[in-house]
UniProtKB/Swiss-Prot annotation:
The gene is lepA. Residues 2-184 form the tr-type G domain. Its main location: membrane. This is Elongation factor 4. NCBIfam families: lepA, small_GTP. Keywords: Cell inner membrane, Cell membrane, GTP-binding, Hydrolase, Membrane, Nucleotide-binding, Protein biosynthesis.
Length: 597
């Protein structure tokens, strides 16, 4: 065990984490030159294309150090995006050390800080690495000072490397061996293994990626999953060197996979503890929590006969993504579809893109909403994720909305505009720290203000320099109302919103105007109204298209013309009674753009 090192790589998006992982694997001979391809550990096509890591992956590598002894290095690749922060914390719990990779030209970003704090809280040894040192814009001295100021760890002896050219990669591995402690664990104790990740394989069922803390696991052992309380027969164990290799056992300190014929991912939750049935561990490992979706949206097939295909596609995606939740729902405007829950906006985006790309779906997505807690007059509390399901206002005591703590890192020259943005989103400033050229702002902001367009606007007000990290804080009572859109007097459930009373008038007017621009003109007049309860706060009319019925009249009596106009008017009136209005997809997305000005 003295010769095992478990480490992961923490980095912000685009700071070169996956490239560095590729280099390390290549250097240790995990893959031959022919098999090397960009981003080896990002096995999903979408991960490669967006250049982000979504699922955690591992590689067990053998490395011969400069002093001649050989070591087993377990590299655990973690997602870097804020939506997947729980997966990051589990990956870090499986390690003794972490490489903090910072781009030498860009400096420290908010997500790096958040993940680094997670690592320090879990007592993981952090080694700073300056990547992209070969760039002409690299400023190692400034970035070292930033790491020390913002994160507060010693960074003078940070390893300087360039994953692209391969410079300094060996120094990184030497630092891993000298500075990261070997795993502690007792091979004699009852088995305890932490599930870092799990995914579904078409041939063998669920594959669990685990870090064995204590004990030994062999094939043919009966295992117990402590959080889901299910037992299974362990069929095979092994390690990834990115390719899978079977082994005869996994013992304390090692990272590998377990296959035990589990059919669904619900049983193998990330962060759960695996132990043996006949000799169970007294208590599970700390830190397990159920992942709760934060953002909800409706997904509807454009063709209603694709409903079954969409259900199958969601089922398949759920096999590999236990945090995705969905339930069937119907909407008068959009027909049959599903209400889906996601970890965050990136997660929603990825799921939608995978449905469209891998399953050829044509989807309409409604505006994302968040979960509200509604306290009723009789004292009971219900949770609502769809605005159209809000009970009658007379029954509601108060509505509580989710509040997040947002940490924003931004260069000094953009602080003013970022603060203005946060205030316009009802943010409350909690802290402001100057660190070198950067400023760290801490705000409490309602989550429903963030899901709309906060991220895009943060990037545009700061010319792309600001970075954001957020975590859920609490539900807090607020003065919220439900805003409905009526088209020809009919409520369109998919367009309902829950908004703050102070901005409801403005939002209603804006939405009605947007709808007027987006709904195509029909043969009859269309009235678009915004309402709060039974109170109409805004109205726009879409004028009818009409034929010039007087074109054939020359001169003649006025009554002749009046007769033709009256006839046309009566026809339009009849049409309006039976006509229904098709609402285009852009109209549903317009909700997102309200309040941009």
């Amino acid at each position: 065990m003295q010769h095992i090192r478990n480490f992961s790589i923490i980095a912000h998006i685009d700071h070169g984490k996956s490239t560095l992982a590729d280099r390390i694997i290549h250097l240790c001979g995990g893959l031959s030159d022919r098999e090397m391809e960009e981003q080896v550990l990002d096995s999903m096509e979408l991960e490669r294309e967006r250049g982000i890591t979504i699922k955690a992956q591992t590689a067990a590598l053998e490395y011969k150090s400069r002093d001649g002894s050989s070591y087993l290095l377990n590299l655990i690749d973690t997602p870097g995006h804020v939506d997947f922060s729980y997966e990051v914390s589990r990956s870090l719990a499986a390690c003794e050390g972490a490489l903090l990779v910072v781009d030498a030209s860009q400096g420290v970003e908010a997500q790096t800080v958040a993940n680094c704090y997670t690592a320090i809280e879990q007592g993981v040894e952090v080694i700073p690495v300056l990547n992209k040192i070969d760039l002409p814009a690299a400023e190692p001295e400034r970035v070292i000072k930033e790491i020390e100021d913002i994160i507060g760890i010693e960074a003078q002896d940070a390893v300087r490397a360039s994953a692209k050219t391969g410079v300094g990669v060996e120094d990184i591995l030497e630092a891993v061996i000298s500075r990261i402690p070997p795993p502690k664990g007792n091979p004699e104790a009852p088995l305890k293994a932490l599930i870092i990740d799990s995914w579904f394989d078409n041939y063998v069922g669920v594959v669990m990626l685990v870090r064995v803390m204590d004990g030994v696991l062999k094939p043919k052992d009966r295992i117990l999953l402590m959080a889901s309380k299910t037992t299974h027969l362990c069929e095979q164990v092994g390690v990834f060197t990115p390719k899978s290799r079977n082994r005869e056992s996994l013992s304390a300190g090692e990272v590998g996979f377990i296959i035990s014929g589990i059919k669904e991912l619900k049983s193998a939750k990330v962060g759960d503890t695996v132990t043996l049935v006949d000799r169970p561990a007294p208590q599970p490992l700390l830190g397990f929590k159920e992942i709760k979706p934060q953002v909800f949206a409706g997904l509807y097939p454009v063709e209603s006969n694709q409903y079954d295909a969409l259900r199958d596609a969601l089922e398949k995606l759920k096999l590999n993504d236990s945090s995705l939740q969905y339930e069937p729902e119907t909407s008068q405007a959009l027909g049959f579809g599903f209400r889906c829950g996601f970890l965050g906006l990136l997660h929603l985006d990825i799921v939608q893109e995978r449905l469209e790309r891998e399953y050829d779906m044509n989807l309409i997505t409604t505006a994302p909403t968040v979960v509200y807690q509604v306290v009723l007059r009789d004292g009971s509390v219900i949770e609502i994720e769809n605005p159209s399901r809000l009970p009658d206002l007379s029954k509601i005591e108060q509505i509580r909305e989710p509040i997040i703590t947002a940490t924003i890192l931004v260069p000094q020259e953009y602080v003013g505009s970022v603060i203005t943005l946060c205030i316009s989103k009802r943010g409350i400033q909690k802290n402001m720290q100057y660190m070198g050229r950067q400023v760290m702002l801490t705000y409490e902001i309602p989550l429903n203000e963030v899901v709309m367009d906060f991220f895009d606007r943060l990037k545009s007000t700061s010319r792309g320099y600001a970075s954001l990290d957020y975590e859920f804080k609490e539900f807090r009572a607020s003065d919220l109302v439900k805003l409905d859109i009526l088209i020809n007097g009919e409520r369109v459930d998919a367009l309902s919103l829950i908004v703050h009373r102070a901005s409801s008038q403005y939002r209603g007017r804006e939405l009605a105007q947007k709808m007027r621009e987006l709904i195509p003109r029909q043969m009859f007049d269309i009235a678009v109204q915004a309402a709060i309860g039974s109170h109409i706060i805004a109205r726009e009319s879409i004028k009818a298209l009409r034929k010039n019925v007087l074109a054939k009249c020359y001169g003649g009596d006025i009554t002749r013309k009046r007769k033709l106009l009256e006839k046309q008017k009566a026809g339009k009136k009849r049409m309006k009674q039976v006509g229904n209005v098709e609402i285009p997809q852009e109209a549903f997305l317009a909700i997102l753009q309200v309040g941009e000005k």
